[in-house]
């Protein structure tokens, strides 16, 4: 919706043409001729590539600073790079792509840490209650993920309808504002809430080490 309706197509074409030409020269010409589709493809590809780069840095940072602190900091910074889309006008292609790349990198730091922190919660359960609840904890996480995807998809459709979106039509200013909110402010809110909640998550680096040592000695 953002690329089809909000981004200036002429500015997008001028921005991606040199990139598409270079990629075609080296045999990577799978983005197509349509500038909107090609731009959206490059936009996503840039985020994914730098997300993978971020993942590769995750363990080293977590070992040094602790999973919770790295996860919380990276999630906060990555969310900032979502929120700033609110301030971009339709011609700010460089800033859009740069923000997407930086968001991908910092969000990539959080991906392996999320699952590692879930395992830490299972360890905490065993350490605190002498009973490991791995299956329940991971199942709850999967239910949350699937529920979030379902609710998120429904919310997108509802919000677009609220702002008067009509497929295949030229969108009014109110609808364009809604689309801009959908890529910036609305998705930022739950992430910022998660960052706030993480302040109450007790398993920091010091507690991680204590739990690990205590469990090793008791097993």
Predicted feature locations:
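Membrane-embedded alpha-helical bundles of multi-pass transporters/translocases
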Residues: 1-219
């Amino acid at each position: 919706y953002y690329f089809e309706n909000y981004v200036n197509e002429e500015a997008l074409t001028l921005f991606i043409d040199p990139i598409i030409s270079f990629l075609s020269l080296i045999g990577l010409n799978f983005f197509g001729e349509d500038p909107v589709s090609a731009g959206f493809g490059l936009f996503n590809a840039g985020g994914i590539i730098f997300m993978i780069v971020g993942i590769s840095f995750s363990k080293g940072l977590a070992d040094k600073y602790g999973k919770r602190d790295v996860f919380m900091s990276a999630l906060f910074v990555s969310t900032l790079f979502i929120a700033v889309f609110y301030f971009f006008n339709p011609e700010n292609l460089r800033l859009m792509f740069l923000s997407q790349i930086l968001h991908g990198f910092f969000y990539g730091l959080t991906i392996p840490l999320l699952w590692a922190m879930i395992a830490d919660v299972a360890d905490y359960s065993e350490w605190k209650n002498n009973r490991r609840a791995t299956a329940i904890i991971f199942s709850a996480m999967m239910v949350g993920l699937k529920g979030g995807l379902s609710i998120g998809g429904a919310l997108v459709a509802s919000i677009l309808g609220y702002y008067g979106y009509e497929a295949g039509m030229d969108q009014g200013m109110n609808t364009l504002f809604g689309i801009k909110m959908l890529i910036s402010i609305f998705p930022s809110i739950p992430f910022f809430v998660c960052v706030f909640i993480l302040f109450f998550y007790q398993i920091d680096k010091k507690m991680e080490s204590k739990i690990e040592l205590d469990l090793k000695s008791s097993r």
